[in-house]
């Protein structure tokens, strides 16, 4: 079966193998995992992975959120058996958190797969994010006014943390379109399932998906390429920021000192963020409040943001604000 499959998918397989080797930012330890839901995207990933240059195992998570999910997981298991790929179904129940069911399901799914990867000696898990996903994410973030880091969108090689579990993710399909992946599945003679939530207008992504579908003149792969350039630019700026931080940030007691002279505003912003994150551990500081904070420091003012007091001057000073006094009733 694998020999026949390899012959059928040879052109796509060459691109796939090259993509994996091209996106690995550090050596791979262990096997490659494949996250498979039964949709066309992940089935194409499974088929390519099965005949790739790498040893693979597959995993499917059944959240129990849809009545047909268990049947879809068994459908994937049958295909894996047919093409000779080890496969495991992980089951769980989802409880909504403050971010909603979809976010809770995503976190739980990745936590389960991280545990599975550790047990199976899987060094990285491949997911089926593709050029259309990348284009949708890029446009969504551009519409929200995201900066360079946000426009970098879906990284091809990244380590995430879910419920305290670390998991390395690889996205080797970012150069493939959704339609090309569906063609791979059909060429190999398989069918796939459809997730109705992909067309749910409740989610912002659905509207951007419809926008792209109604605009065939928009080249998804070109947008994905733009996101890749943003990723490279982000990495370059972070490299410069790390060097400037080592030279310009000093700690004396509980106070951090920053030399702000002759710095581009983007590097200065990132250095201020590093100083504040060092003090509070808060990595979510962004947006207009941070811009106002920096402008006040440039004017030599004393100002507070997110429990950090900043004082402008020749050297900017940062320290944790004293605890607020509780009101006496």
From Swiss-Prot:
Gene Ontology terms: biological process: tRNA modification
Residues bound to ATP: 37-42
Domain of life: Bacteria
Catalytic activity: cytidine(34) in tRNA(Ile2) + L-lysine + ATP = lysidine(34) in tRNA(Ile2) + AMP + diphosphate + H(+)
Primary localization: cytoplasm
SUPFAM superfamilies membership: Adenine nucleotide alpha hydrolases-like
Molecular function in Gene Ontology: ATP binding; tRNA(Ile)-lysidine synthase activity
Keywords carried by this UniProt record: ATP-binding, Cytoplasm, Ligase, Nucleotide-binding, tRNA processing
Listed InterPro entries: Rossmann-like_a/b/a_fold (IPR014729), TilS/TtcA_N (IPR011063), tRNA_Ile_lys_synt (IPR012094), tRNA_Ile_lys_synt_N (IPR012795)
GO cellular component: cytoplasm
Pfam families in alphabetical order: ATP_bind_3
Subcellular location(s) per record: Cytoplasm
EC id: 6.3.4.19
Family, per entry: Belongs to the tRNA(Ile)-lysidine synthase family.
Function of the protein: Ligates lysine onto the cytidine present at position 34 of the AUA codon-specific tRNA(Ile) that contains the anticodon CAU, in an ATP-dependent manner. Cytidine is converted to lysidine, thus changing the amino acid specificity of the tRNA from methionine to isoleucine.
Domain remarks: The N-terminal region contains the highly conserved SGGXDS motif, predicted to be a P-loop motif involved in ATP binding.
NCBIfam families in alphabetical order: lysidine_TilS_N (TIGR02432)
Protein name per its UniProtKB record: tRNA(Ile)-lysidine synthase
Organism the protein comes from: Zymomonas mobilis subsp. mobilis (strain ATCC 31821 / ZM4 / CP4)
């Amino acid at each position: 079966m694998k020999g026949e499959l390899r012959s059928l998918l040879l052109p796509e397989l060459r691109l796939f193998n090259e993509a994996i080797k091209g996106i690995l930012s550090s050596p791979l330890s262990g096997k490659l995992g494949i996250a498979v839901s039964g949709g066309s995207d992940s089935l194409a990933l499974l088929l390519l992975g099965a005949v790739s240059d790498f040893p693979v195992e597959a995993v499917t998570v059944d959240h129990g959120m849809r009545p047909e999910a268990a049947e879809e997981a068994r459908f994937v298991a049958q295909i894996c058996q047919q093409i000779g790929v080890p496969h495991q179904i992980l089951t769980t129940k989802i409880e909504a958190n403050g971010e909603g069911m979809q976010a809770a399901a995503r976190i739980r799914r990745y936590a389960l797969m991280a545990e599975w990867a550790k047990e199976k000696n899987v060094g990285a898990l491949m997911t089926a994010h593709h050029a259309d996903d990348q284009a949708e994410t890029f446009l969504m973030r551009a519409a929200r006014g995201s900066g360079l880091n946000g426009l970098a969108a879906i990284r091809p090689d990244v380590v995430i943390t879910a419920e305290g579990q670390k998991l390395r993710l690889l996205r080797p399909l970012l150069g493939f379109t959704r339609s090309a992946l569906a063609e791979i599945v059909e060429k190999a003679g398989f069918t796939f399932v459809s997730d109705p939530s992909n067309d749910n207008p409740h989610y912002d992504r659905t509207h951007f998906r419809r926008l792209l579908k109604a605009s065939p003149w928009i080249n998804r792969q070109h947008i994905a390429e733009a996101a890749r350039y943003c990723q490279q630019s982000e990495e370059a700026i972070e490299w410069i920021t790390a060097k400037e931080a080592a030279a310009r940030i000093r700690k004396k007691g509980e106070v951090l000192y920053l030399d702000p002279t002759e710095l581009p505003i983007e590097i200065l912003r990132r250095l201020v963020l590093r100083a504040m994150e060092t003090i509070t551990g808060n990595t979510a500081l962004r947006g207009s409040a941070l811009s106002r904070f920096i402008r006040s420091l440039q004017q030599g003012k004393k100002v507070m943001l997110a429990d950090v007091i900043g004082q402008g001057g020749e050297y900017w000073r940062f320290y944790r604000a004293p605890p607020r006094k509780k009101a006496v009733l």
